[in-house]
Amino acid sequence: MSRIVFDASAVLAMILKERGGERVEMALDQTSQGVATEMAISSVNWCEVLTKLQRSPASLTPEELAGILSGVEVVPFERSGAELAAQISLQAPFISLGDRACLALAQSRKAAAWTTDKLWAHAKVGVSIEILR
């Protein structure tokens, strides 16, 4: 079974029809067709997506977003995740808190982290990173 943790940028690329978003859409489609893929997003990244969508023409309610991402688990950002994110800041101080929340969740689940942020290519944090564009 493959495991994916989405960064906010990957989800936004799909919703806003930006380059790289088609890969997220394909992963969601495959899961709905029975392909075994475990997908998750940190509650921090969920908040980032909702915040960005409130300010864009593609305004979606939290319920509409949940429907689009029905196969994606929203994982609460708790103490263990915060501690991992803090460790990641020592290895990659240029990565934001939201990005570190994604990487910490991917690390804890032994999953690939999907993002559109090219800066992540420089993050050597022991997580498989897929840069979608």
Positions of predicted regions on the chain:
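Acidic, metal-associated active-site segment
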Residues: 8, 49, 96-112
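Acidic catalytic patch
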Residues: 70-92
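Alpha-helix capping/helix-boundary segments
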Residues: 10-11, 45, 81, 101-102, ...
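A short glycine/serine-rich beta->alpha loop
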Residues: 33-36, 89-93
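Acidic, PIN/NYN-like endoribonuclease modules and their adjacent C-terminal/linker elements
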Residues: 1-3, 71-75, 103-133
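Histidine- and aromatic-rich ligand-binding microenvironments
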Residues: 6-7, 40-43, 94-97, 117-118, ...
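A general structural signal for well-ordered alpha-helical segments in protein cores
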Residues: 21, 46, 62-65, 82, ...
